[in-house]
């Protein structure tokens, strides 16, 4: 919503910022094993779904985006007071995670990550942590 209200100032979602400004300055070393990625509703609305998935693919050997899961149902902070919405929205997540052998999940919204962690059986954290774990600064970023 902020992007819609503020016209002159460009705001970046974290994965978008990394993809746009840091990707060429970092050396990526993909980590072994599959990771899960949850594309948030706001990323879909902004047309950035591919950005977080592409970023994760630079960082991991295998990226799992559970097709059975769209919205996580946390709805900002509503999941704290209505956890049944989150439970229903993510009812198909755990089997996908277990089948694929995923040990960690990544997203870009802390409240989504809380619900995803509770329902999947694996920790979900910001995609920024995955990027930090799999990158080092390039010696000559302009080269």
Per-range role (PLM):
Residues 1-143:
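Iron-sulfur cluster-binding electron-transfer modules in prokaryotic oxidoreductases
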């Amino acid at each position: 919503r902020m992007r819609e209200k503020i016209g002159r100032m460009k705001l970046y979602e974290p994965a978008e910022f990394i993809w746009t400004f840091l990707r060429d300055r970092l050396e990526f070393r993909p980590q072994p094993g599959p990771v899960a990625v949850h594309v948030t509703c706001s990323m879909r609305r902004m047309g950035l779904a591919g950005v977080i998935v592409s970023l994760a693919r630079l960082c991991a050997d295998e990226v799992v985006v559970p097709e059975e899961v769209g919205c996580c149902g946390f709805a900002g902070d509503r999941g704290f007071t209505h956890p049944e919405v989150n439970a229903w929205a993510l009812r198909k997540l755990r089997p996908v995670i277990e089948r694929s052998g995923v040990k960690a999940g990544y997203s870009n919204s802390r409240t989504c990550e809380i619900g995803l962690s509770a329902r999947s059986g694996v920790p979900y954290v910001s995609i920024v942590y995955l990027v930090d774990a799999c990158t080092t600064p390039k010696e000559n970023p302009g080269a």
